[in-house]
Structure formats: structure tokens, C-alpha cells
Amino acid sequence: MQYQNPNTLQAVILDWAGTVVDFGSFAPTQIFVEAFAEFDVQVSIEEARGPMGMGKWDHIRTLCDQPQVAERYRKAFGRTPTDDDVTAIYQRFMPLQIEKIAEHSALIPGALDTIARLRVQGIKVGSCSGYPKQVMDKVVALAATNGYIADHVVATDEVPNGRPWPAQALANVIALGIDDVAACVKVDDTVPGILEGRRAGMWTVALTCSGNALGLTYEQFRALDAATLASERKRIEAMFEGSRPHYLIDTITDLPAVISDINARLARGEMPQSN
């Protein structure tokens, strides 16, 4: 037997918040702010957005490791936050997130049509998220009422290590019966999500405008003037540079053109690992 490069894509692995649902990725961000506030520690929306894409416990740990947040915690409690403190914040975060997730469950405009176009091409739809399963179960149920059902879902606590490690993306490959990781594309609005796809050996597509990086509602995004939008795209592209996404697009509605381009590159013998 000989190895043969795949010549067409078999699967997309889609993130959830900021990619398919919750334009601007508001659900997790606001809850981080509220969870810290219950411990009398102020965290801004901008600070809360920083580690987005990681599993939520890791996200809180990363926030607590930031010097300015650690100092606020020290002033409130007389010590810097330990792992036990992180767990306490996480345990408050979880019920708040479950309680309020429905407020930010709308599908991103055009997502359903885009996914339908991919399925017509025989492309399977895997998915993963920085949410734990307890939250994902509710997110998945809400999305189903709006017409979106992924072929597979992997929550961050269903693998040994979440993003930026590749386990969630690779769990989708196994569950979907994909022949080769190079026949997959990971689509995400965060740096950890793009690193996940890169480390899994997949093609990667970073979303610049629908998710955490821009942090606007769909209406606010549509209202941006051309100069501001161009400036924001440039800022966000620089943010993603170190994770080396193969493509950067505004929203999931731009994905079909990318899929066509990747298929053409695969047909020429190109592989994601060599780019």
C-alpha cells in the first residue's frame, strides 16, 4: 500500500460561539465578567475576551495569571488566586452560563445556508467548543430548534486537553470516519481554535468579524464604515498572524469560496502541513 494525498475535502470542523451561533461571541464573555464580580474582582469585557477559545477553566486560570487581575484578586482576598480559587470561580461561572446561554443562541446570519451548501458537496460537519458538555448540551439543543444540527459535537471536557491542543478536532476525525486530517478544515474565530486545527494537521480558516476578535453585534458590524472595517480587519489579521491560519474571512458566509480553493489546492497535490 502507498500513501496518497486526499484530493478533496471530507469535513469541516466548526467552532460554535462566534462561528455558527452568537455573533460577536457575547455569551461567554459577559458571564466571565459577572462570575468574577461575584468575588468582588473587576474584569473588563476586553480582558475577558483575551483567552477566548480555551476551555473555560483554563480561560479563568489564564485571566487570573494576568498581573492586573491577580493584583485585584490579591487586594480582595490577601493572596493571588490558586487553582482552588479558579475552580470556585468556574463553579460560579457554570450555572450563570447555563442560565443565560439562550440569550445569545441565535444563528449567525447565513450560517444555515452555508452549511447546507457544504452538505450538498458531501462534506461532513463536525464541531467543537471551549464550552464543557453541560453547557454544550444546551447550546446544541437551542441550535437544533433553529435548524442547525452538527454531525458530531466535542465539548472541551470530553478530551484530556482542550484547545489549543488538537484533541477535540481529532476526536471529530475519528467519529466522522475521515480518511485523512488533510481532508479537513477547522473554522474558528479564536487563536486557540486555529492552533488546534494547525496542530491537528488540518486546513484552517480564521473568522475576523463574526466572533471574539471584533466583538460586535451583527448590526454593529454591518454599520461600520469602510475605513473602520478595513482598520479592524488589519488589527485582527495581525492578532491571528502567529497562529498561521491558511485563510482569513469575515464570516462563515464566505466559507464556500474557501472550500473551492482548498479543493483546487488538494487536487494540485498541496497539503495543509506544507503551508
Swiss-Prot record:
SUPFAM superfamilies in the cross-refs: HAD-like (SSF56784)
Q: Which gene encodes it?
A: phnX
Q: Which reaction does it catalyse?
A: phosphonoacetaldehyde + H2O = acetaldehyde + phosphate + H(+)
Q: What does this protein do?
A: Involved in phosphonate degradation.
State where Mg(2+) binds.
15, 17, 189
Sequence similarity = Belongs to the HAD-like hydrolase superfamily. PhnX family.
A single GO molecular function term of this UniProt record: magnesium ion binding
The note describing how and how many cofactors are bound reads: Binds 1 Mg(2+) ion per subunit.
Keyword Nucleus tagged: no
Question: Transmembrane stretches, by residue range?
Answer: none
Source superkingdom: Bacteria
Q: How does it assemble?
A: Homodimer.
Protein's recorded name: Phosphonoacetaldehyde hydrolase
The processes (GO biological process) annotated in the record are:
DNA repair; organic phosphonate catabolic process
